[in-house]
Curated annotation (Swiss-Prot):
Gene3D superfamilies: GTF2I-like
Matches recorded under Pfam families: GTF2I
GTF2I-like repeat ranges per the UniProt record: 98-192, 323-417
Annotated GO MF terms: DNA binding; DNA-binding transcription factor activity, RNA polymerase II-specific
InterPro entries per the UniProt record, alphabetical: GTF2I, GTF2I-like_rpt_sf, GTF2IRD2, RNaseH-like_sf
Record protein name field: General transcription factor II-I repeat domain-containing protein 2B
Length: 949
């Protein structure tokens, strides 16, 4: 919206870059105000001149009007710069008052204006009200002025010396007026004669003339003061206002105007102002000025902005609502923020709102998944959302859900939002048992109906839970029937917690028959809870007709390598289960033989049938896939001994290959500069804070940059994108700190950066798709094949210099041959992907038979399955069901006449496509196994992790 025109006026030899930056920031802030005014259908046009630059800021129509008047811009620039601000003599005012151009007079005027503003604020309005100095000096207890320096009494600014005036302006944020006893004269009335209003400071274009303007004022809602003025006729006497600017160390520029406005104010002391309901037949322009009820917007603004008198003139078609648009937007943002806080609290397992870490969620995609957002609305902090987006979010509130996939870096979710409940002194009351069917078990309120626990003994929480979930069915129980139902539910809870009632001791029966806050039941050890889960897992494993395992390793806080083993199995009903099988500490050697012995021991612990093992997914390290002594080789040998002819499939993780492929681009000359500058900014707190402020003032899209790490390679694309979109800001910031980056001025380097941005964003999109929940191996393979096809397409497009799929590169491309330079890099990337996916090529026919049974060619099917596949392809009933439900649900409807094909599908369905599930476990381990609880035994940690997964 802002436009800058370079003037031909002479430039000062020593210009302050810091002052220019301040001017640029303020113009940017003014531009943001114009955007908000445009949403209210108000038109604004502003011209600012600084040295040789002319800034045009305003709404679309306002800028169009000013841009059409280039002569007006030139005249205004010459007037402001050619003569010099200090040499301009103001025209003689009508009332004969002389306005001095000296420094003291300007400061006195600024102090007087601020006193008027503070006095008006004390009266409950945001407009400036003349201060009754004589009355205040006569009756000093009526109005108290706070914040003045010691030894300085309140008086008219014309009696202050230069040093006192400067001190007042530098510390004006702490000055305030307190009215203990209002004055009853007409001067004190809001809208009385001599009142300084926004209308006095409005400027009419010098090229246009207008007649008197009738101004109707409306009383503020909260002021409690009735306005006496019925109409104000404003006449403009001066065509060319004089603008004075004074820069003082430690303060921002303040402006005053010496234009004189004659006001005719007919007063009626007996009749308050009442808005007329009749249409106005006066051809003169009618303007309504409404007071702003939000005083915080004035007190919290910057010092330089407080001195600016911004007039908003609107012509409403109908009566405005009581709440201003700013208050409505604020309410919307608060409602959306409360919604997000409640949803985030539910995601981390608490029943109260928790402050949402918006920055961490935005800069760490994939850690927290937000489902149910309206189409086209991206999750952001409410302060960055449009009004329409916030309304759509509130309409879809019941569908929005937060899911924590993996912990956010630097955020302990186990401690987020925890309240100091012990300090609240809440006690469970016995009457809540009968009212809401709750009892206290181990000092925790527990619902007798659904066994759900509340974190706090608070009646509101218990009543809300009961009315929301159970009142419909349990309100029918009254008096004696309700007591009997309560006794019955207590027995059910006792059986639920302790199992059979025959084994209970009398003490335990007494605990649950008469629960009280002072009685405590024994705590069930975590090993016992995990033992029950392990027993259920053993039963589930025995029902598997096919299963696969995924193996990965990581080093914990104790510098111990932890080997995680996951199992994925399919039963006869084609129900898929993914469970943690075991975690094994690797304290000795980490050879393939040692890993095999640990895995074999874990499988024996669960009595797993080796003949049903289909595949093993690993990270592809030498200890895993070595042809002689690797883990996969030994597992294949063991499976062959149990089931002759069986072949164990080996799958290398297909999530990590694009990280390795990204290294094949060989663009370290770009990444080194980006990493160096980003880490320099982010690793120093002061630099990071200042850079965030810089981006905020320049109204950039991103508030900060992502900190780049080699381990967290997923951040590569996000870092590059934010770096490219903030090139100008980074260049300016680094240069101002004595760390210039000459590469940012190189066209070739910027072109390489743009290509790397596009390429890494494509790779990140692929990675996020591969990390979906419950992914079938065929779906993941389809995603990789699709990406390979895209690489071929991009290679063809680049030969024609078609940059349709490289939008960032297209922005900086200037020559038709720019795309040709990157064809070899695409070719290398394609070759590397094909090499990494060679394992899947071996099983492509089997995967195709699983995903597309009705379109597979019989010649590509294994001989033992051909007859059943032919029968299947000719079965129209199953074909209809396949088209309706798709895979994998379709295989639940297969009849018993396809036993071999069903077994084949069960094996494919059981395969892991990656070790991503292991990485999720390691995230939980890092979150839980901190330095404060790292001394637990391995068996205890095994139990904890098993319960957590």
């Amino acid at each position: 919206m802002a436009q800058v025109a370079v003037s031909t006026l002479p430039v000062e030899e020593e210009s302050s870059s810091e002052t220019r930056m301040v001017v640029t920031f303020l113009v940017s802030a003014l531009e943001s105000m114009c955007k908000e005014l445009a949403k209210s259908k108000a038109e604004v046009a502003c011209i600012a001149v600084y040295e040789t630059d002319v800034f045009v800021v305003g709404t679309e129509r306002g800028c169009a009007f000013v841009n059409a008047r280039t002569d007006f811009q030139k005249d205004f620039a010459k007037y402001c710069v050619a003569e010099g601000l200090c040499e301009v003599k103001p025209p003689c005012p009508v009332n004969g008052m002389q306005v001095h151009s000296g420094e003291t007079e300007i400061l006195r005027k600024a102090v007087e204006d601020y006193f008027c503003f503070c006095y008006g604020k004390a009266l409950g309005t945001t407009v400036m009200v003349p201060v009754p100095y004589e009355k205040m000096l006569r009756d000093q207890s009526a109005v108290v002025v706070q914040g003045l320096p010691e030894g300085v009494a309140f008086q008219h600014p014309e009696n202050y010396d230069l040093a006192t005036l400067k001190w007042i302006l530098e510390n004006k944020a702490g000055i305030s007026f307190i009215i203990n006893r209002p004055f009853l004269g007409p001067e004190s009335q809001l809208g009385g004669p001599g009142m300084v209003t926004d209308a006095e400071r409005s400027i009419v274009s010098p090229s246009e003339s207008c007649g008197p303007i009738n101004v109707k004022t409306e009383p503020m809602e909260d002021s409690g003061i009735s306005l006496k003025a019925e109409a104000v006729s404003v006449k403009k006497e001066s065509e060319d206002p004089n603008y004075y600017q004074y820069n003082m160390q430690g303060s921002h520029p303040s402006s005053t105007s010496n234009e004189v406005i004659e006001m005719e104010l007919p007063m009626e002391d007996s009749t308050p102002l009442v808005p007329s309901e009749e249409p106005n037949e006066d051809p003169e322009a009618e303007v309504k000025i409404e007071g702003n009820t939000n005083s915080s917007s004035v007190t919290n603004s910057a010092a330089g902005v407080e001195d600016l008198n911004i007039v908003q003139v609107t012509v409403p078609d109908n009566e405005k609502e009581r709440l201003s648009s700013i208050e409505k937007i604020k309410q919307l943002r608060e409602q959306v923020n409360d919604l997000f806080s409640r949803k985030f609290g539910e995601a981390i397992g608490v029943d109260f709102p928790v402050k949402v870490p918006y920055r961490k969620i935005t800069f760490n995609p994939g850690c927290v998944v937000i489902d149910g957002m309206p189409p086209g609305v991206v999750f952001k902090a409410p302060g960055y959302l449009e009004i329409s987006s916030m309304r759509r979010i509130l309409e879809a509130a019941e569908f929005i859900k937060f899911t924590v996939i993996r912990p956010l870096p630097g955020l302990e979710l186990s401690n987020v939002g925890k309240r100091k409940i012990d300090q609240e002194g809440r006690v469970f009351q016995e009457k809540w048992e009968r009212a809401y069917f709750f009892v206290e078990v181990q000092n925790i309120p527990t619902c007798l109906i659904c066994k759900q626990s509340m974190s706090v003994s608070k009646e509101y929480n218990l009543r809300r839970h009961y009315q929301t979930n159970h009142s419909k069915h349990y309100d029918q129980y009254t008096e004696r029937m309700r007591d009997e139902k309560l006794h019955e539910l207590k027995k059910g809870l006792r059986k639920y917690l302790l199992g059979s009632s025959d084994t209970e001791c009398p003490e335990q029966k007494q605990v649950f028959a008469n629960p009280s806050p002072t009685q405590k039941s024994p705590v069930q050890p975590v090993e016992d809870l995990a033992g029950n889960l392990w027993e259920k897992l053993r039963e589930k494993i025995r029902s598997f007709v096919a299963y696969s395992i995924a193996i990965d390793e990581i080093t914990d806080i104790n510098n111990t390598t932890q080997l995680a083993i996951f199992i994925r199995g399919v039963d006869e009903n084609f129900d898929v289960s993914e469970e943690l099988l075991d975690t094994v500490p690797m304290t000795g050697t980490k050879s393939g033989n040692e890993i095999f012995l640990r895995v074999e021991k874990s499988l024996k612990k669960f009595c797993i049938n080796w003949s049903r093992l289909v595949s093993v997914a690993s990270t592809g390290t030498p200890a895993m896939v070595d042809a002689n002594n690797g883990l996969v080789t030994k597992l294949k040998s063991r499976v062959a001994t149990f089931c002759k002819g069986a072949e164990l499939k080996s799958i290398c993780c297909i999530i990590h290959p694009e990280s390795l492929c990204a290294q094949k681009l060989k663009m370290d000359h770009v990444m080194d500069v980006v990493v160096k500058s980003v880490n320099w900014i982010c690793s120093r707190g002061l630099n990071h804070s200042e850079f965030t402020t810089l981006l905020y003032e320049l109204d950039s899209q991103y508030g900060s940059l992502l900190y780049y790490t080699e381990i967290k390679w997923l951040s590569r694309g996000l870092v590059l994108k934010r770096f490219f979109e903030s090139l100008e800001e980074i260049d300016s910031f680094m240069s101002s700190r004595g760390k210039p980056l000459p590469q940012l001025s190189s066209i070739d380097w910027i072109r390489d950066l743009a290509f790397l941005v596009d390429m890494t964003m494509h790779l990140n999109a692929l990675n996020i798709s591969l990390q979906g929940h419950s992914q079938i191996v065929t779906q993941m393979y389809d995603l990789i094949r699709a990406f390979l096809a895209k690489l071929c397409l991009w290679e063809t497009h680049l030969t024609r210099n078609n940059l349709a799929h490289f939008p960032t590169l297209k922005l900086v491309s200037r020559n038709e041959s720019d795309g040709l330079n990157y064809i070899p890099k695409i070719a290398e990337l394609k070759t590397e992907f094909q090499k990494r996916l060679s394992d899947f090529k071996l099983y492509e026919s089997e995967l195709t038979l699983f995903s597309s049974p009705f379109s597979t060619k019989i010649d590509s099917v294994h001989e033992e399955l051909q007859m059943e596949v032919i029968d299947l392809q000719c079965n129209t009933v199953l074909k209809t069901k396949y088209d309706k439900v798709g895979i994998p649900e379709f295989y639940k409807y297969l009849w018993g006449s396809y036993p071999k094909y069903k077994h084949h599908c069960a094996k494919i369905l059981s395969m892991f496509g990656s070790t991503y599930i292991c990485e999720q476990l390691f995230s939980i381990m890092k979150l839980s196994k901190t330095k404060y609880c790292s001394q637990l035994k391995d068996s205890q940690w095994d139990s904890v992790l098993h319960i957590a997964t």
